[in-house]
A protein has these predicted regions:
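Aromatic/pi-system hotspot detector in well-structured domains
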Residues: 86, 106, 149, 224-229, ...
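A beta-strand-loop signature enriched in Asp, Gly, Thr, and Trp
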Residues: 256-261, 286-288
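Hydrophobic alpha-helical segments and helix-packing faces
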Residues: 26, 82, 232, 260-268
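HotDog/MaoC-like acyl-thioester-processing domains
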Residues: 2-15, 117-200, 299, 306-345
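Non-catalytic linker/capping segments at the edges of enzyme domains
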Residues: 1-52, 60, 68-74, 169-255, ...
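Hydrophobic beta-strand-centered segment that forms part of the acyl-chain substrate-binding groove
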Residues: 49-61, 69, 73-130, 267-310
Length: 345
């Protein structure tokens, strides 16, 4: 008997993987995550500011709407960094993809509510579609699995509901599964939650009053901010362990073909940190339009980025901004093209 995740030819459409521990978002978890990804979002760092903006009490919020979650411990009114939330959800989903070779896409990653410190995340992963790849001479056979990842909090309120497409090897090198699903349909109809509903009751004017610059309206679509200084990628296996990510390529150099690969969310977390350096008025992230990993990242690489303003929509004392982060390795290649929707005040 071997304790391991499934290979592609052991998956079936509709198969569910609910047996993964829930994760409570604690101060310690957030602090370690910050030490690796460099969280600079003021709302997830400053409890007093979070109380001003969201109206949640530091002693534990009681909201039941779609926005901020309900906490139970000290500081529970402070929203968790969004990168911590999606890192945990993705990590919990790797119970289905321990043998993953690559992730081809993420779709529909839009927040349904913003968890706070003290909330617990529980994730179920289901196989939404399967397609075996065409054989390629000299390469082991692989297939693509479209996974629907549903994360709720301790009160069963939706937090995230998105799709991830993983490339997995077959256990039987001569296996023919016949799987030929149209994976373009996976998550294609996913709609973002209403940003106005997510931010219901938030006082963005209180955030803006703290003088973070540039504020909403001071940058316009087409503006590009180059972020001075890079960030070294460090503690990659520790981030994977922290978020329950058991994909072998992030832990085992043999599984990765000789050099461990950095978890894609690690690169995204550093990109978000650099975006917050460029735009200190960045309040939070509502969701992703697209996320393309263009080249492999390894521990010890240094990453630089630019942030482009692609769209802007006013929301009273602040607004929604469509941002595009382009991340490059110091060695030359672009490694990430990430387009996301954020709140700026």
């Amino acid at each position: 008997m071997k304790a391991e995740g499934p290979y592609f030819d052991e998956l079936t459409a509709g198969q569910a993987f609910p047996t993964v521990p829930g994760v409570t978002l604690t101060e310690g978890l957030a602090a370690v995550h910050q030490s690796i990804t460099g969280d600079r979002l003021a709302l997830s760092l400053d409890t007093a500011l979070a109380e001003e903006v969201t109206g949640a009490s530091a002693g534990g919020g009681t909201g039941t709407g779609p926005g901020v979650g309900t906490g139970t411990g000290p500081g529970a009114g402070r929203p968790a960094n969004p990168a911590l939330v999606w890192d945990v959800a993705i990590g919990q989903s790797t119970v289905a993809t321990q043998h993953v070779k690559a992730n081809l896409f993420y779709r529909g990653l839009w927040f349904r509510r913003f968890p706070v410190i003290g909330d617990t995340l529980r994730t179920t992963t289901r196989v939404d579609g399967l397609r075996q790849n065409r054989p390629r001479e000299g390469r082991a056979p692989t297939g693509l699995a479209a996974l629907r990842i549903t994360t709720v909090d301790q009160h069963e309120r939706p937090v995230l509901d998105f799709w991830r497409c993983a490339m997995l090897p077959l256990r039987d090198p001569s296996g023919q599964t016949g799987h030929a699903d149209d994976l373009d349909a996976a998550g294609a109809s996913a709609k973002p939650a209403s940003p106005a509903a997510l931010l219901d009751g938030w006082r963005l004017d209180r955030f803006a009053a703290h003088g973070f610059w540039p504020q909403y309206g001071e940058l316009v679509p087409g503006d590009v901010v180059e972020v001075a200084g890079g960030d070294v990628v460090s503690n990659a296996p520790e981030l994977a362990r922290l978020t329950l990510n058991i994909a072998a390529v992030h832990h085992d150099e043999q599984a990765a073909g000789g050099t461990r690969l950095v978890y894609g969310g690690h690169t995204i977390g550093l990109a978000l940190s650099q975006a917050a350096r460029a735009l200190p008025g960045l309040v939070t992230v509502v969701g992703w339009f697209s996320c393309d990993h263009l080249a492999a990242v390894h521990e010890g690489d240094t990453l630089h980025s630019s942030v482009e303003i692609e769209s802007a929509e006013a929301l009273g004392a602040g607004g929604l901004v469509g941002l595009r982060s382009r991340v490059y390795s110091a060695s030359g290649p672009q490694v990430l093209d990430w387009r996301f929707l954020a709140v700026l005040a």
